[in-house]
Amino acid sequence: MAKIKGQVKWFNESKGFGFITPADGSKDVFVHFSAIQGNGFKTLAEGQNVEFEIQDGQKGPAAVNVTAI
């Protein structure tokens, strides 16, 4: 899978999910905290730049292997 760059649209820490807007302007992608790479508390900040891959989830496309850049 190819890495895609994007920006966090919003992320709800208490619910553990949010959405990423891909840099190419395509449809926002769902992101779950379990897809965030790294140790410790996994969260994303609104406006944060990230790289990720897209995988088909139960409710449509979802971001996986998410890393901050």
Swiss-Prot record:
UniProt keyword list: Activator, Cytoplasm, DNA-binding, Transcription, Transcription regulation
SMART domains the UniProt entry points to: CSP
Residue ranges annotated for the CSD domain, each copy included: 6-66
Gene Ontology molecular-function annotations: nucleic acid binding; protein homodimerization activity; protein-folding chaperone binding; RNA binding; single-stranded DNA binding; transcription antitermination factor activity, RNA binding
Cellular component annotations (GO), alphabetically ordered: cytosol; membrane
One of the GO biological process terms: cellular response to heat
Main location group: cytoplasm
Superkingdom per UniProt: Bacteria
InterPro entries (alphabetical): Cold_shock_CspA, Cold_shock_domain, CSD, CSD_CS, CSP_DNA-bd, NA-bd_OB-fold
Subcellular location field: Cytoplasm
Name listed for the protein in its UniProt record: Cold shock-like protein CspC
Organism annotation: Escherichia coli (strain K12)
The organism's taxonomic lineage, starting at the top: Bacteria, Pseudomonadati, Pseudomonadota, Gammaproteobacteria, Enterobacterales
Gene: cspC
